[in-house]
A protein has these predicted regions:
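Beta-strand-enriched, solvent-exposed domains that form extended recognition/catalytic surfaces
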Residues: 1-67
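General structural signal for secondary-structure boundaries
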Residues: 4, 78-80, 218-219, 225
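A generic short-segment signal for beta-strand/edge and adjacent turn/coil regions
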Residues: 39-42, 88-91, 170
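Alpha-helix boundary/interfacial micro-motifs
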Residues: 42, 93-94, 201-202
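Conserved, compact domain cores that house catalytic/ligand-binding motifs in diverse enzymes
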Residues: 65-160
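C-terminal cap/substrate-recognition subdomain and adjoining C-terminal extension
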Residues: 131-227
Length: 227
């Protein structure tokens, strides 16, 4: 908000858990200590006493222990292949223009994350959509619309080496339980295999497209059998 002195509210499960006022630069700092582990959806909105129009934004807060296993999932592996050139994820309010999820992807990933894995969704930046925060917001909305488990969304450049570099960065920061990735592209699988980690490709790629040590699942029902 480009105004100072405006009230901002942080909501968890529909309840206001923190408030703050914007400073001269239009920013506000909200403090909240989570009471449980996992991925926590939250909303930030302009307070009811504000002089500006009601605005709100949603995001997810990852409250993860370093010892809990993490699975990285390439967003493209959750979606049916496009029949024509179109957006990577569903545009808000335009479901017909978006990509549909692969059969059983939401339920299959839900079973993996229910008791064991935290999930890191990896999506490629889209210059047509715009800034990475917009790409992240669209990805979050698409995942929510199609009942996928809540997780952290990571937006990376289209450079094939981008995820490998991020994987090294995460491991160096102590997130060494990120040892497996489920993806659609060869570059994504190779980022794990080159580091002696596990990779599952879904759906089954064309002949010769799967790296030698990658596990291949014909669909999401088959993914759990490969892990």
């Amino acid at each position: 908000i480009p105004l100072g002195g405006e009230p901002i509210e942080l909501l968890i499960a529909g309840n206001v858990v923190a408030t703050a006022m914007t400073g001269g630069d239009g920013r506000a700092f909200l403090s909240y200590i989570p009471k449980a582990k996992g991925s926590l959806p939250f909303t930030v909105r302009v307070g009811t006493t504000s002089k500006v129009a009601m605005v709100e934004a949603a995001a997810n807060l990852a409250v993860w222990e370093r010892r809990t296993p993490i699975i990285a999932v390439e967003m493209a592996s959750l979606m049916e292949a496009p029949t024509a050139q179109g957006p990577t994820v569903t545009l808000p309010g335009k479901d017909a223009e978006g990509r549909q999820p692969m059969p059983d992807a939401a339920s299959g990933l839900g079973k993996l994350t229910q008791f064991y894995y935290n999930v890191l969704y990896v999506v490629t930046e889209d210059k047509v959509v715009g800034a990475n925060d917009l790409v992240s917001a669209q990805a979050r909305q698409w995942l929510s619309d199609h009942k996928f488990p809540v997780g952290h969304i990571l937006v990376l450049s289209s450079d094939p080496a981008a995820f490998g570099a991020k994987l090294d960065e995460l491991h160096a920061a102590g997130w060494k339980t990120l040892k497996i990735g489920v993806g659609r592209t060869k570059a994504f699988a190779e980022a794990f295999l080159q580091r002696r980690l596990d990779a599952v490709m879904v759906p089954e790629p064309a002949m010769g497209e799967a790296p030698r040590k990658a596990k291949v699942a014909k669909d999401w029902k088959d993914v759990r059998k490969k892990m």
